[in-house]
């Protein structure tokens, strides 16, 4: 299995180095749910600004303040502790009057707004995230500048970031041990983390192999294509390749790669043979996913950061802004820009 640091680059390995997250203010994330609170209902949506505390900690503190069980406070996604982040929490308070959340006190956390809502906010129920990153001590400004220009046109590999695999790859190692021993895993969180790491690693492997081809965005017979921003896909046939290639070049369609699991992967013929060969050596992880009934799915192979802009504060410091859809990783964008020092694994998804 290829480790994250050794995965194939779309724009070649960066020539320079730089520092990501010298301080929390260098990594700002603003959650985009894609909808507004209903203004009525038994739930309360609470938009918070936090710095130095993780999402679960804030959710538990909010539950205590509202005198409800911790399970009654939900969120769409975990946000990094060591960053400045805005996100929504959702508290279920049936039959209660609207509390004064301006009185909620927690170090490093501020309530920005809150309103009634009809539905629980579930994990993954967000449109995306807006990022503002500051890279410091950049050793090769010209290389980073050209890479930013290239990313605007060609995007970046849609890799799952190192944080998906745990510090030191612990989640993937857990999945491998589980696959090899077949010992039942009772802890639901471990099961979820390990299965997710296994499937994500196989996806990354397929994308890394595809990137080694001369033209990564060349449609081949049997490719599974999806409309940009949509989840469903269809299979490319030889008769349609010219027209489908035009639509891929126009970013109307995206070539996808497999998230292996039980059931059909979605590709056929040449594309299916390529994907199967790319992960042929990982029989244990594939068998684990099938055994645990994790359904196969598809994910876009490339990622195009939206609203990408940047500003050089000086020759060694650049501020970069962009928006990514839910499930994508800012660190996979940074990886194509600079060689960073430190481990990405501590950065929450």
From Swiss-Prot:
GO molecular function, one term: RNA binding
Keywords, ordered alphabetically: Isomerase, tRNA processing
Residues bound to substrate: 27, 129, 329
GO cellular component, one term: cytosol
Coiled-coil stretches noted in the UniProt entry, renumbered to this chain: none
EC identifiers of the protein: 5.4.99.27
UniProt superkingdom: Bacteria
Reaction equation(s) it catalyzes: uridine(13) in tRNA = pseudouridine(13) in tRNA
Protein role: Responsible for synthesis of pseudouridine from uracil-13 in transfer RNAs.
Protein name: tRNA pseudouridine synthase D
Species assigned in the record: Escherichia coli O157:H7
Organism ancestry: Bacteria, Pseudomonadati, Pseudomonadota, Gammaproteobacteria, Enterobacterales
């Amino acid at each position: 299995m290829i480790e994250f640091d050794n995965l194939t680059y779309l724009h070649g390995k960066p020539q320079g180095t730089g520092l990501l997250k010298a301080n929390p203010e260098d990594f700002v994330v603003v959650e985009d749910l894609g909808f507004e609170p209903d203004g009525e209902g038994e739930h309360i949506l609470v938009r918070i600004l936090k710095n130095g505390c993780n999402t679960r900690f804030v959710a538990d503190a909010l539950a205590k303040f509202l005198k409800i069980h911790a399970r009654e406070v939900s969120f769409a996604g975990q946000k990094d502790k060591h960053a400045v982040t805005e996100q929504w929490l959702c508290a279920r308070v049936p039959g209660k009057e609207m509390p004064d959340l301006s009185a909620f006190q927690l170090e490093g956390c501020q309530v920005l707004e809150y309103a009634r809502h009809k539905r629980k906010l579930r994990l993954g129920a967000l449109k995306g995230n807006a990022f503002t990153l500051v890279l410091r001590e950049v050793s090769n400004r010209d290389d980073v500048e050209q890479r930013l220009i290239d990313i605007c046109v060609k995007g970046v590999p849609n890799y799952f970031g190192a944080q998906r695999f745990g510090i030191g790859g612990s989640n993937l190692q857990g999945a491998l041990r589980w696959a090899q021993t077949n010992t039942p895993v009772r802890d639901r969180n471990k099961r979820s983390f390990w299965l997710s790491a296994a499937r994500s690693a196989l996806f990354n492997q397929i994308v890394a192999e595809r990137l080694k081809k001369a033209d990564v965005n060349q449609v081949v017979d049997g490719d599974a294509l999806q409309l940009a921003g949509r989840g469903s896909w269809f299979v490319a046939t030889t008769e349609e390749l010219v027209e489908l290639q035009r639509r891929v070049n126009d970013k109307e369609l995206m070539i996808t790669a497999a998230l292996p699991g039980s059931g059909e992967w979605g590709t056929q013929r040449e594309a299916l043979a390529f994907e199967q060969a790319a992960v042929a050596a990982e029989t244990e992880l594939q068998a684990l996913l099938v055994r645990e009934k994790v359904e196969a799915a598809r994910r876009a192979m490339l990622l195009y950061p939206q609203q990408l802009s940047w500003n050089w504060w000086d020759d060694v410091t650049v501020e970069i802004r962009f928006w990514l859809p839910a499930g994508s990783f800012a660190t996979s964008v940074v990886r194509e820009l600079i060689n960073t020092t430190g481990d990405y694994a501590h950065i929450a998804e």
